[in-house]
Curated annotation (Swiss-Prot):
GO terms for molecular function: rRNA binding; structural constituent of ribosome; transferase activity. This is Large ribosomal subunit protein uL2. NCBIfam families: rplB_bact. Disulfide bonds: none annotated. The lineage of its organism: Bacteria, Bacillati, Bacillota, Bacilli, Bacillales.
Length: 276
């Protein structure tokens, strides 16, 4: 993927960068793999905001992605590489030999016309999905399952990858893109290769309006609010927060406070925590 820069014809254009979408081969998605997607705007079933800074944005259709990769032994051919507004990675439309069509996360260097396959007997080739007990040590992988048959949950964002470091009984040891090293059951599946769209992290939003197109609302500092809106608010001019440590709008400590559970069940599988 290339990155397009603009002449500074306005303050919004000055820093803005956009993708050239060179890898995208079609702008029309497969209708049978689309689903309606209603906007939640950060609200729960009571209508209360549970996630701030969400709302608005362009209307989207959800693309049904095959994270399970459980169509074993049937060869699929890459028909298109497409843009997906719901994720940072691109997606690939796969036409299988039995006539079924599925979307998958598009790995780096996967091209139209390439053949992929899933299952324990699949070759170690970009886009193929196998149980991790069949993947050689040192292989770069993505779309990793945490529970057998549940579908890939880890390493799905653009440009990310993990590495299979070794084996430990019925587990494999995997180093994730965050730097965390953890054990995962060796029956769980993973896809060979790195997630595509590597330049996504280099994009610059450039202006506030483009964030609004993405459904991201402004983040307002508590110190510029009134005291009835935030514990940091009020005072004359640029007043300090008047507390030992910063807090959330609801008075709970934040900015540096650890929020992970003390007795998280997954602690037993983590060998080395992620990089800070």
């Amino acid at each position: 993927m290339g990155i397009k820069k603009f002449k500074p014809t306005s303050p919004g254009r000055r820093q803005m960068t956009v993708s050239t979408f060179e890898e995208i081969t079609t702008s029309t998605p497969e209708k049978s793999l689309l689903a309606p997607l209603s906007k939640k705007a950060g609200r729960n079933n009571q209508g209360r905001i549970t996630v701030r800074h969400q709302g608005g944005g362009h209307k989207r259709k959800y693309r049904i992605i095959d994270f399970k990769r459980n169509k074993d032994g049937i060869i699929g051919r890459v028909a298109t590489i497409e843009y997906d507004p719901n994720r940072s990675a691109n997606i690939a439309l796969i036409n299988y030999a039995d006539g079924e069509k599925r979307y998958i996360i598009a790995p780096h260097n996967l091209k139209v016309g390439d053949q992929i396959v899933s299952g324990a007997d699949a070759d170690i080739k970009i886009g193929n999905a196998l149980p991790m007990e069949k993947i050689p040590v040192g292989t770069t992988i993505h779309n990793i399952e945490l529970k057998p048959g549940k579908g890939g949950q880890l390493v799905r964002a653009a440009g990310t990858s993990a590495q299979l470091l070794g084996r430990d009984g019925e587990f494999v040891i995997v180093r994730l893109s965050s730097g965390e090293t953890r054990r995962i059951h060796n029956v769980c599946r993973a896809t060979i290769g790195q997630v595509g769209n590597l330049d996504h992290e280099l994009l610059n939003i450039g202006k506030a309006g483009r964030s609004r197109w993405l459904g991201i609302r402004p983040t307002v500092r508590g110190s510029v609010m009134n005291p009835n809106d935030h514990p940091h608010g009020g005072g004359e001019g640029r007043a300090p927060i008047g507390r030992k440590a910063p807090v959330t709008p609801w008075g709970k400590p934040t900015l540096g406070l650890k929020t992970r559970k003390k007795k998280n069940k997954s602690d037993q599988y983590i060998i080395r925590r992620r990089k800070k």
